[in-house]
Amino acid sequence: DVLYRTILMPGFDQPFVEYHNFGAYMDTVFGEHINRDGWVTINFIPTAAHTIWGCLAGKLLVSDKTPVQKVKYLALFGVIALAIGFGPDWTHITPIIKRIATSSFTFASEGWVLLLLALLYWLIDLKKFNKYAWIAAVVGMNSIFIYYFFNTAGYQWFNGAVAIFIKGLFGMAGITPKIL
């Protein structure tokens, strides 16, 4: 966020406006074009935090702490990350923008992930509700294939099959495809 607020180039001087921010400027430097979907290359820096936090969560899960302590730590850090992420967004300091990976987005998304991890760890490892855990194991063992499948042929097939239900459901709620 500091770079977005301090490095203001002509035409790229609006920190959180799509196509007119530091990330868009850096895309023109790196590849001489701006991504039409608003994604920026420079967001690899803040999103590296997700990898680091994932490693720390993994270290916690394999530590000597009791399972209850692990759930408490995951939930506590999840709530703290949510507060750090949503606080600046709610006070209009830094908006949550996924495509440029603002600090608010990075913390808010990590908070949700840690809370979900705490819930799943509690359900599967503590309460032994693992009847359907094999599905997650299969997906985890084939994650690269699943990623590529849903970004190529699966994207067209899955979106077409699911769109009938999702568009109607979200349409009734007033959520447009642009928001999704």
Where are these regions (language model features)?
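Alpha-helical transmembrane segments and their immediate juxtamembrane cytosolic regions
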Residues: 1-180
